[in-house]
Amino acid sequence: MSSGYSANQYENAFNSQKLQNWTVPKHFKERPSAAQGHTIFIASDRGHLLPGVKAKRGSAWPDFKGTWELPAHLPPASINPTARSEEGRQRLTHTYTHSGHGIHTHRAAKTTAAPAADGQTEGDQTCNAPTSERPVTGERPVTGQSGRGERPLTQASEREQSLTLTYSKRREQSLEETPQLEREEPQ
């Protein structure tokens, strides 16, 4: 289909002969001329360097470190507490502090912390639970449960818990105590 068209059919339409200023446009060759000299072969047909050709010394990746060049102790992961719940941040902090690795936390902004009831500022508070209540590293509570039932993990579970309480209270109410609109009529 394209055998009847030349390769430069569109090119000539965009070659401006008048640049709308006083400079003369520079015309380049349509096809470049051949390079001077000849190509020197440095490798055989099998891809090996020919004798007499100097091989380049040094590595192409000078900064690469293999497994054996890595340090014996890798630096610990840093925890970014942004967009985490307080309980999730404490769990991560606890896991890293008790796993034998150090911990680095990022602070997004410096806030003015009001002193807590025990005199500590909000930023100075740490997990002061007795060691018997702390889970051993690696033993995390099952998703949806928080340790020993202290409080739910998310706001959604708090909402669900409050809804179940209201439904159970409604069931406990007698039929006479409920208003006329809320009564369920037996069918």
UniProtKB/Swiss-Prot annotation:
Residues 169-187 have a biased composition (Basic and acidic residues). GO terms for biological process: cilium organization. Keywords: Cell membrane, Cell projection, Cilium biogenesis/degradation, Cytoplasm, Cytoskeleton, Membrane. Residues 97-187 are annotated as: Disordered. The keyword DNA repair does not apply. Pfam families: CFAP126 (PF22611). InterPro entries: Fltp. Residues 122-131 have a biased composition (Polar residues). It is found in: Cytoplasm, Cytoskeleton, Cilium basal body; Cell projection, Cilium; Apical cell membrane; Cytoplasm, Cytoskeleton, Cilium axoneme. GO terms for cellular component: apical plasma membrane; axonemal microtubule; ciliary basal body; cilium. Microtubule inner protein (MIP) part of the dynein-decorated doublet microtubules (DMTs) in cilia axoneme. Acts as a regulator of cilium basal body docking and positioning in mono- and multiciliated cells. Regulates basal body docking and cilia formation in multiciliated lung cells. Regulates kinocilium positioning and stereocilia bundle morphogenesis in the inner ear. Belongs to the Flattop family. This is Protein Flattop. It comes from Salmo salar (Atlantic salmon). The lineage of its organism: Eukaryota, Metazoa, Chordata, Craniata, Vertebrata.
